Amino acid sequence: MSLLDYFKTKKKPSTAATAKERLQIIVAHQRGERDAPDYFPQMKQEIIEVIRKYVKVGADQVSVQLDQNDDNLSVLELNVTLPEQS
């Protein structure tokens, strides 16, 4: 029987499992934002405005994230998807 099981197609994860995984990602992201300093939303907006001064990008093309470690270390991560040059 195990030989036949080898040839069977693997089952897709259920929609409930997919929804649970997505929800866990959202909750983790919101927890990270909750621990951010009070000035972070304004700083994030100002960084995006400066980038838009020089490069035409949409809000969905700029990602600013603040990660904090237990060692009292903060990392500001900035990802910008630049448009292709013509």
UniProtKB/Swiss-Prot annotation:
Biological process (GO) annotations held by this record are:
cell division; regulation of division septum assembly
Pfam families given in the database record? MinE
Q: Which UniProt keywords apply?
A: Cell cycle, Cell division
Is this entry keyworded Ribosomal protein?
Answer: no
Q: What InterPro entries does this protein map onto? A: MinE, MinE_sf
Q: What NCBIfam families does this protein map onto? A: minE (TIGR01215), PRK00296.1 (NF001422)
Q: What functional role does this protein have?
A: Prevents the cell division inhibition by proteins MinC and MinD at internal division sites while permitting inhibition at polar sites. This ensures cell division at the proper site by restricting the formation of a division septum at the midpoint of the long axis of the cell.
The UniProt family comment states: Belongs to the MinE family.
Q: Which HAMAP family match?
A: MinE
The name this protein goes by in its record: Cell division topological specificity factor
Q: Write down the species.
A: Shewanella piezotolerans (strain WP3 / JCM 13877)
